[in-house]
Design a protein with these regions (language model features):
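Hydrophobic transmembrane alpha-helices
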Residues: 1-51, 55-59, 87-95, 157, 161
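Glycosyltransferase-associated regions of secretory-pathway enzymes
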Residues: 5, 10-13, 93, 171, ...
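Residue-level signature of the transmembrane alpha-helical core
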Residues: 19, 23, 47, 61-65, ...
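Interfacial aromatic-anchored transmembrane helix boundaries in multi-pass membrane proteins
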Residues: 26-39, 62-97, 126
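Hydrophobic side chains within alpha-helical segments
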Residues: 32, 42-45, 70, 122, ...
Length: 193
């Protein structure tokens, strides 16, 4: 907000950053696509929300639109329009939480509930029986999603230096440090392979 109380318009630099963060969601998901329901999207959405606040919705919906452009429109896209919003809202509610374990539990719980949240679309389109059968058949994948989200958040989410920077209001620096940390964590183990 400006001194007059109005929101300032988004500049080109900020617009490009938000678009690139959305693209990063897709690229990191595709990089780990060979693992069933193990993806860093939830982790990055939590980081984006911690650093950017409500502006994290912009990269989230850039990601959703790119998913639709690549994979086509389907019922699963409909759930993406609200499921990621749920995660951003939860992250905003717990934004001041400092416990890495708390963030890991939030991320894991989101992964576990992902199928149930997505089943709402199938309830509207096919009724309770269809939604319930769809959700139950996906529980093994929700368990993998839960475990992956929990582990990634516990290990990678907001390392100590990043949390220190956030407290000092240096969000952009925190985001840059986080991505350097994430890239090192994901790429270094492969260097010896």
């Amino acid at each position: 907000m400006t001194a007059s109380g109005k929101h300032r318009p988004m500049g080109a630099r900020e617009l490009v950053l938000l678009a690139l963060l959305g693209a990063l969601l897709l690229v990191t998901k595709l990089a780990l696509a060979w693992l069933p329901n193990i993806e860093p999207v939830s982790l990055l959405v939590l980081v984006y929300t911690a650093v950017l606040g409500w502006k994290a919705l912009a990269p989230v919906y850039v990601y959703v639109m790119m998913e639709i452009l690549i994979w086509g429109l389907g019922f699963w896209n409909l759930c993406y329009t609200y499921v990621w919003l749920v995660l951003v809202v939860l992250a905003m509610l717990f934004r001041k939480m400092e416990s890495p374990l708390g963030w890991a539990v939030l991320s894991g719980a989101f992964g576990l509930s992902f199928g149930a949240l997505c089943a709402l679309v199938y309830w509207v389109t096919g009724g309770w029986a269809f939604a319930l059968s769809w959700w139950v058949s996906g529980i093994p994948f929700d368990l993998l999603h839960c475990a992956g989200n929990f582990a990634m958040a516990l290990v990678l989410l907001l390392p100590p230096l990043c949390r220190y920077k956030l407290k000092r209001g240096q969000g952009r620096m925190c985001l840059a440090l986080y991505f350097a940390y994430l890239a090192a964590a994901l790429l270094l183990p492969r260097a010896g392979a």
